């Protein structure tokens, strides 16, 4: 992921939401 969230880590669920 080129643009990662400020949390630092991204879970599979959050990644799926971001890709929606």
From Swiss-Prot:
Superkingdom field: Eukaryota
Regions annotated as coiled coil: none
Main location class: mitochondrion
Pathway of action: Energy metabolism; oxidative phosphorylation
Location in the cell: Mitochondrion inner membrane
S-S bonds: none
Protein family (similarity comment): Belongs to the cytochrome c oxidase VIII family.
Subunit structure: Component of the cytochrome c oxidase (complex IV, CIV), a multisubunit enzyme composed of 14 subunits. The complex is composed of a catalytic core of 3 subunits MT-CO1, MT-CO2 and MT-CO3, encoded in the mitochondrial DNA, and 11 supernumerary subunits COX4I, COX5A, COX5B, COX6A, COX6B, COX6C, COX7A, COX7B, COX7C, COX8 and NDUFA4, which are encoded in the nuclear genome.
Protein name as catalogued: Cytochrome c oxidase subunit 8B, mitochondrial
Organism of provenance: Thunnus obesus
